[in-house]
Regions:
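Glycine-rich beta-to-alpha active-site loop
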Residues: 126, 131
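N-terminal beta1-alpha1 cap of cysteine-dependent amidohydrolase-like domains
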Residues: 1-123, 136-138, 143, 147-153
Length: 153
């Protein structure tokens, strides 16, 4: 019997404005999650989906010993989930609108994952935002807002 493929899935990140106790008595803090449809799409008797936690050295808890190295060695491939737009700063631009700041924490985390998996010779697949991140990781650029930046498109 062969072992199933172990496919890493990048975490989507929920950043609350500040940690608060919600009505259910649960502290709302930074959360990592996997979109259910992605899990359903990946999972089969031959594939185990493994969410890779985001490691950020700029977080509230300072841990300089955390690393994503082991995931690229242990897993057979990587899927980058969709979600919010990339932070324009990630591809060398300032946001055209204050609401378009993106998620620089997730960008750094996923760019690190891409680098590690590519160096390990492992396949990487991007879903929506993940495709945009792969484009930027390999030197590409993005339009922040196609209707205002490319009205003829």
């Amino acid at each position: 019997m062969t072992r199933p493929l172990l496919i890493g899935v990048s975490a989507r990140i929920y950043h609350p404005a500040s940690p608060v106790l919600d009505l259910g008595g649960v502290w709302t803090r930074t959360l990592h999650y996997l979109e259910q449809s992605v899990a359903h799409w990946l999972m089969s008797p031959q594939v185990l989906a493994v969410m890779i936690p985001a490691v950020d050295r700029d977080s509230i808890v300072q841990r300089s010993d955390l690393s994503l190295h082991g995931y690229a060695d242990a897993l057979d491939g990587l899927v980058l989930q969709g979600g919010n737009d990339l932070a324009p700063a990630t591809y060398g631009e300032a946001p055209l609108h204050p609401d378009w700041a993106g998620d620089a924490v997730r960008d750094r985390y996923e760019l690190d994952l891409v680098q590690r998996f590519v160096q390990a010779g492992k396949p990487v697949l991007g879903i929506c935002r993940g495709c945009q991140l792969l484009n930027v990781a390999f030197g590409g650029t993005l339009w922040q807002d196609i209707p205002s930046q490319q009205p003829q498109a």
